[in-house]
């Protein structure tokens, strides 16, 4: 501003006096006082009511007039470089919240009398005035171009005006202060919401651009011509240009546009002046005038003027002002605007906005004729103006010059004027295409920059109710139309050949949002387009994306999980995490360990690091990541989505959890808007095999998926190069014990506990169909091999019953025999892997190698198969699930570290099998490890009646155990011969619930003495210690 005009703070006393000469007539009497006191510009900006009174301005109204004009100077001096729509919205939002805080603070005070008083305090009214002042500053921007021409900003302006009027009405109502405050609180909250909406439009360049000053010189002014500007003055002294007369000096300079604010005339600041004084200053020098204009943001194009500029009338979003009778200071314009409206044309005054023409702007060629015959047919019956008669004829040459400035791929925003035209009329010929459409104001959320297309804007394009049209050449449209068709066929999985481009494209635009597809169909079918004005856009990238979205049904089956961990590559963060499964039943295992990989704001999890397909994935930008305090699992966090589902994860250590949370939040912050998924099925995907997680479901007899969960020889496992990097803990499949589900097989540990499971190759992995087709062995069992056929070991054993054959083939029934008797002996290379002493469920799909063992199993006493043997004994306390899993995992690792392979006879195998099955040589059930306790608790029978009885028995045993503990507590007191009153009082306070239960059970045995016993109990709790001793 220093290069254009001198700051107000550096004004001399003479400049202050010159400025005051243009103020209201009633203030001219005080100029001599200002001149006598030599008030400088800095003093003027800081002047107060008291100083004005010292200068002889005694009337409050005169003081307010001066202070309002000074406020305008302060805004010009201090806020020019920082003032924009966003900062003004912040100020209004702050004023509204300050008023809310003021009201809530008054109500918290002890001397609040708002329910009885009807007089608002002065400081309250001051806050209301400040709020309205902040709203006026915002409205000063919204009430003029370019914001007034945008529907969204126009609606916002009307809302702010309505709320301010409501606020002034509420203050003047006759009601209690409490009622007034409630109404004002509602208004303030609504205003805050409006401001937040404006602030949220940060992508709109009009919101964040500040105003700037520009000096314009108009010379060679003819006395009969005038300047040709239309100016509207606000009541507080702002002068806004609303339009120009065509072919006038203001029009020819091409620098004066609607919405510009006049700051200086011939280097004399006119802010706060009366309108007549401004007009006199403009006419002071007949040869020319130098104007300093404050120009608000118009567009992002700095290389050429914005297409919005040089509008001749008030925007359509605002109602035109009806000119009143001119005053003595109003001059008649030297040239009038011919407006082909239904009203009679009349000479409009310089200081008012002319009404808009009925027809939209139609560009013309050099001869002043319309360039297209279609437009002649369209405008039949209406007057057509040529040359300078057109209200915007200056745009004809300028628009032709400006058209080639923007590159071919630039998005141009145009105004579609053609109404009711058929598709044959709307198709483009080989004629020049520059004169079809007239660009007007940029809609909200869009900018004029063509080199860079923000992905956020591309995403919003598909959701806007009004789309935008890109105006392009014939060849470009044909090319993009072909790409649209090719991509549509590509997405449906069909091949298409390139078609030859035709000279006349069947359609010159395409509607992007689904809301506008009806209009497109009508254009293609040849039906007239509805008489509505639409904004359209044509973007090649968005068009292809739309095509993919429409045809997604054909490729939706292809999941993002079909990528191996190796092909996924190294992620931004990876490691072992626990994942909580959906609880299918009370007895199902809730947490399972997976290998997680964070890649490009997507989280994948695999069974191990060599898995060929992800077990699941989620798109993190769609989810909210936070700590999961509601989980009992330590170091748990969650990914929540209000409309889909929530996922729960847990880390081993606090540092791991913090590392994952930091990485996820850092990655999703950048992808939250750019990579948002369009379809809900892309938010997440998970393996379907977890659906059959409970034996009570109809899928309980279905075989598990052919994943690698079978044991393998030590030579193969120990040579595995895939070792978990950070923790020497069991891998996900090693620590995830098999529950009552059929698909969760336990990964057997063969070497060190740090060895990760190995993904089986296709030759080593066999499906259940292959197993069914496998020939039976001599024992009548399918041998479920985990190695190639030549490495498998078959044994000759006696045949068993079909029931036992089924139990050895399908894992769902394995709890009836092998959980009690132990696993069948395996081949020599595999035997020691299963017999690992971890208390987990033995494997049920291997072949018995000793017929004597079968005979023993078939002749075992019935008590060994009693389901009650599976019940958890009362002497072992129930612990949290996660603690048991960790303890069991450590126990498994310790027992497998020094495991040695030994060859033994059938008797040794039988003894070890009984030991692993937690059975004594006599067939009695014997508990060995903590995991065994847990497994025995979750074992279930297919008979629901038996399950209910077992559950009842567990309840009784748990109750008995609790009672035994209570009896032990009571015996401790009764067995103390030196018990004192103080000790008993302490004991009673510590076990008050137990004491009350004892008293209640005692009184229930004798109904006749209930009242007396209750009285004694009550008095025993309240009286002295001596009475308590007597009562005991």
Curated annotation (Swiss-Prot):
InterPro entries for the chain: CNK1-3_SAM, CNK2/3_dom, CNKSR, CRIC_domain, PDZ, PDZ_sf, PH-like_dom_sf, PH_domain
PTM-bearing positions, type Phosphotyrosine: 683
Low complexity bias spans: 324-340, 730-740
SMART domains membership: PDZ, PH, SAM
UniProt domain CRIC: residue ranges: 84-178
Coiled-coil boundaries: 874-917
Biased composition (Acidic residues): 683-693, 875-888
Sequence ranges assigned to domain DUF1170 in this UniProt record: 302-515
Cell location: Cytoplasm; Membrane
Protein name: Connector enhancer of kinase suppressor of ras 2
Organism in which the protein naturally occurs: Mus musculus (Mouse)
């Amino acid at each position: 501003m220093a290069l254009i005009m001198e700051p107000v703070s550096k004004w001399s006393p003479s400049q202050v006096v010159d400025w005051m000469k243009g103020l209201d007539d009633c203030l001219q009497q005080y100029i001599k006082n200002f001149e006598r006191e030599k008030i400088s510009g800095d003093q003027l900006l800081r002047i107060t009511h008291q100083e004005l009174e010292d200068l002889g301005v005694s009337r409050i109204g005169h003081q307010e007039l001066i202070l309002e004009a000074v406020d305008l100077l302060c805004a010009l001096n201090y806020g020019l470089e920082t003032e924009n729509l966003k900062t003004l919205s912040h100020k209004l939002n702050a004023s509204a919240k300050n008023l809310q805080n003021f009201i809530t603070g008054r109500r918290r005070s002890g001397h609040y009398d708002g329910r009885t008083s009807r007089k608002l305090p002065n400081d309250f009214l001051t806050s209301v005035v400040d709020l309205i002042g902040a709203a006026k500053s915002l409205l000063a921007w919204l009430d003029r171009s370019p914001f007034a021409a945008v529907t969204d900003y126009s609606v916002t302006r009307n809302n702010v005006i309505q709320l301010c009027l409501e606020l002034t009405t509420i203050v003047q109502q006759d009601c209690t202060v409490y009622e007034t405050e409630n109404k004002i609180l509602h208004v303030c909250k609504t205003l805050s919401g409006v401001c937040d909406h404006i602030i949220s439009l940060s992508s709109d360049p009009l919101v964040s651009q500040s105003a700037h000053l520009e000096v314009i010189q108009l010379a060679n002014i003819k006395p009969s011509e005038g300047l040709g500007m239309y100016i509207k003055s606000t009541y507080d002294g702002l002068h806004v240009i609303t339009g120009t007369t065509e072919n006038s000096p203001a029009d020819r300079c091409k620098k004066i546009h609607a919405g510009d604010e006049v700051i200086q005339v011939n280097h004399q600041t006119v802010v706060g002046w009366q309108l007549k004084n401004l007009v006199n200053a403009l006419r002071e020098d007949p040869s020319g005038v130098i104007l300093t204009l404050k120009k608000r943001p118009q567009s992002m194009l700095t290389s050429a003027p914005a297409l919005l500029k040089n509008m001749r009338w008030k925007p359509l979003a605002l109602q035109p002002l009806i000119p009143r009778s001119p005053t003595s200071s109003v001059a008649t314009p030297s040239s009038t605007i011919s407006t082909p409206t239904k009203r009679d044309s009349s000479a409009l005054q310089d200081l008012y906005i002319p009404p808009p023409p009925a027809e939209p702007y139609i560009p013309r060629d050099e001869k002043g004729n319309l360039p297209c015959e279609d437009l002649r047919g369209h405008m039949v019956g209406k007057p057509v103006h040529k040359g300078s008669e057109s209200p915007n004829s200056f745009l004809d040459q300028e628009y032709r010059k400006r058209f080639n400035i923007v590159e071919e791929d630039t998005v141009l925003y145009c105004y579609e004027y053609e109404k009711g035209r058929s598709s044959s009329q709307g198709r483009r010929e080989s004629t020049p295409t520059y004169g079809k459409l007239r660009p007007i104001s940029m809609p909200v959320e869009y900018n004029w920059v063509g080199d860079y297309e923000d992905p956020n804007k591309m995403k919003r394009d598909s959701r806007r109710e009004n789309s935008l049209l890109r105006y392009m050449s014939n060849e470009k449209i044909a090319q993009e139309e072909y790409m649209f068709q090719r991509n549509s066929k590509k997405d449906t999985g069909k091949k298409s050949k390139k078609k030859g481009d035709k000279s006349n494209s069947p359609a010159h635009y395409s509607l992007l949002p689904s809301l506008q597809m009806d209009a497109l169909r009508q254009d293609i079918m040849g039906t007239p387009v509805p008489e509505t004005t639409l904004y359209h856009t044509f973007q090649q990238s968005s068009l292809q994306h739309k095509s993919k979205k429409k045809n997604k049904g054909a490729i939706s089956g292809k999941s993002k999980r079909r990528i191996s961990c190796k092909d996924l590559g190294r992620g931004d963060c990876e490691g072992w995490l626990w994942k909580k499964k959906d609880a299918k039943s009370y007895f199902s295992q809730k947490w399972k360990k997976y290998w997680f990989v964070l890649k490009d704001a997507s989280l994948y999890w695999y069974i191990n690091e060599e898995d060929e397909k992800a077990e699941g994935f989620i798109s993190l930008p769609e989810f909210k990541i936070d700590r999961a305090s509601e989980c009992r699992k330590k170091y748990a966090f969650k990914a929540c989505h209000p409309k889909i589902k929530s996922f729960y994860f847990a880390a081993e250590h606090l540092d791991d959890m913090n590392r994952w949370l930091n990485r996820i939040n850092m990655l999703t912050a950048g992808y939250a808007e750019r990579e948002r998924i369009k379809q809900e099925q892309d938010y997440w995907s998970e393996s379907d095999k977890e659906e059959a997680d409970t034996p009570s479901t109809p899928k309980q007899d279905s075989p598990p998926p052919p994943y690698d969960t079978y044991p393998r020889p030590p030579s193969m496992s120990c040579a595995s190069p895939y070792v978990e990097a950070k923790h020497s803990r069991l891998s996900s499949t090693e620590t995830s014990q098999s529950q009552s589900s059929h698909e969760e097989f336990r990964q057997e540990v063969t070497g060190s506990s740090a060895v990760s499971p190995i993904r089986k190759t296709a030759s080593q992995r066999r499906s259940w169909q292959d197993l069914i087709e496998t020939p039976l062995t001599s024992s009548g069992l399918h041998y479920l091999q985990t190695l190639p056929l030549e490495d498998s070991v078959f044994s000759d054993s006696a045949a068993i019953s079909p029931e036992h054959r089924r139990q050895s083939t399908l894992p769902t029934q394995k709890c009836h025999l092998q959980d009690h008797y132990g696993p069948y002996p395996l081949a020599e290379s595999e035997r020691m892997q299963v017999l690992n002493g971890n208390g987990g469920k033995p494997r049920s799909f291997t072949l018995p190698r000793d017929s004597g063992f079968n005979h023993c199993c078939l002749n075992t006493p019935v008590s060994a198969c009693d389901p009650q043997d599976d019940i958890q004994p009362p002497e072992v306390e129930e612990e949290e699930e996660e603690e048991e899993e960790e303890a069991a995992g450590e126990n498994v690792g310790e027992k497998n570290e020094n495991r040695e392979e030994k060859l033994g006879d059938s008797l040794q195998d039988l003894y070890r099998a009984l030991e692993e099955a937690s059975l004594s040589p006599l067939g009695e059930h014997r508990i060995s490890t903590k995991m065994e306790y847990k497994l025995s608790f979750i074992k279930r029978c297919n008979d629901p009646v038996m399950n209910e009885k077992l559950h009842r028995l567990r309840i009784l045993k748990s109750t008995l155990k609790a009672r035994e503990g209570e009896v032990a507590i009571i015996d401790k007191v009764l067995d103390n011969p030196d018990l004192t009153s103080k000790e008993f009082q302490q004991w009673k306070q510590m076990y008050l619930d137990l004491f009350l239960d004892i008293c209640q059970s005692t009184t229930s045995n004798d109904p006749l003495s209930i009242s007396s016993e209750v009285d004694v109990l009550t008095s025993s709790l309240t009286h002295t210690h001596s009475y308590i001793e007597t009562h005991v």
